[in-house]
Amino acid sequence: MPQKQKVNVKIGDSVTVISGFHKNETGEVLKINRKNGKIIVKGINFKFKHVKPTTENEIGEIKQFEAPLHHSNVKLNLKKVL
């Protein structure tokens, strides 16, 4: 049974991607999956899914969604309070 991983960000936090294709991009945390240590960040890591039509009257479509990132690939943005 996999253990839950400690994730140092919360929903609504501003984070910066520190590695990978989207390096140095910032976004807001939308969802956290502690079971596998992945988070979904708003506006980062878009993927496309091609959906076939299921009936004759329906048409196929391309759905765009934000894929999860591993929590070790992001860092928390700290705002300095004066």
Curated annotation (Swiss-Prot):
Principal cellular location given in the protein's record: plastid
InterPro entries: KOW (IPR005824), Rib_uL2_dom2 (IPR014722), Ribosomal_uL24 (IPR003256), Ribosomal_uL24_CS (IPR005825), Ribosomal_uL24_KOW (IPR041988), Translation_prot_SH3-like_sf (IPR008991)
Location of the protein in the cell: Plastid, Chloroplast
GO cellular component, one term: ribosome
Pfam family membership, one: ribosomal_L24
Subunit: Part of the 50S ribosomal subunit.
Protein name: Large ribosomal subunit protein uL24c
Lineage of producing organism: Eukaryota, Sar, Stramenopiles, Ochrophyta, Bacillariophyta
Gene transcribed to yield this protein: rpl24
